[in-house]
Amino acid sequence: SDLQSNKKSIEPKVIKSNFSPYKTLDTFFYKNKIFVSYSNKKENCYNFNIDYAEFNLNELNFNNFYQSTECSIQNYYQPHGGKMQYYSNNQEDGLLFTIGDNNDIPKPDDSIVGKILFIDFQNQNEVIFSQGHRNTQGLFSNDEIVLSTEHGPRGGDEINKISYNKDYGWPFASYGEPYGSKIYHPLNKFYEKPKYLKNHSKKNFSEPIFAFAKSIGISEIIKIPNNFSNFWNNNFLLSSLWEQSLFRIQFGDNYNKIMFYEKIFIGQRIRDIKYHNELNGIILALEEKGQLGIITTKKID
């Protein structure tokens, strides 16, 4: 059925800043600081960056927090993902963040492409946390678990339970199907595209918790507080682009499987979702019309 909601206009506020990226990927708030991940275009390549600023509604003065030394060749690859979450790694506080890899060519183990990385706040030291990721669009972290969502090729969108130093298979294993039969390499060569392994574990890759056979255009994943609804206890929400829907999810013990999911049709591509404490509601970033949607169990004045 159609969602019923009260309309509330939100007047946008323009905040002055010294921030001028080529492509913004994600924003994240931590202890009155705003972190922004983005890609920058160099002379003939793209690199990945994170800047931060003390949050101020009048003006934001950004400083660089992280800049990749690796630069991806123009017209071959641009950084994707860029999702960020707080994480404590060996008692060091920092950020987990994702750098996607839409290309089928295997990357060196020391490349940041197709990885989830950790960088600590104090020294900005970079650690590869996990690898074998295609295009990680959603990231969730708390004291109990790290979860990610990942676009597959022509199907095979994944929900993954992330563990340190594990390999999740891309570009060798996927439940999706190849686009075309050739791989383009930046040295102007073409290679036959191999078929993807469907059983990740045969080659010691980590299996996803769940994979959608048909692509939903998977995006963000969040946990819903139990006070949102008595009927949604210990539930997660997953957003989607292609399906224009939310998916309410219940995981099993130890997050090794999904017990059930419920599809909730919204009718627009949902790029991002966040829970808002004061509203006790879920805010949706609706892509096609540039709108914000709110789902709440109480009346909005």
At which residue positions do the language-model features occur?
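Residue-level marker for isolated small/hydroxyl-bearing positions within beta-strands
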Residues: F35-S39, T98-G100, T149, S239, ...
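Asp-box/WD-like beta-propeller blade repeats and closely related beta-sheet repeat scaffolds
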Residues: Y22, N44-S88
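Surface loop/turn motifs at the tips and blade-to-blade linkers of beta-strand repeat domains
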Residues: V14-S20, Y66-Y76, V127-G132, A211-A213, ...
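Beta-propeller domain segments
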Residues: G94, D101-M259, E278, Q291, ...
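Conserved blade-ending motifs and adjacent loop-strand segments that build the rim/top face
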Residues: N256-N277
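Beta-rich catalytic cores
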Residues: S20-L25, Y30, Y46, Q78-H80, ...
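Beta-propeller domains
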Residues: S1-I15, L57
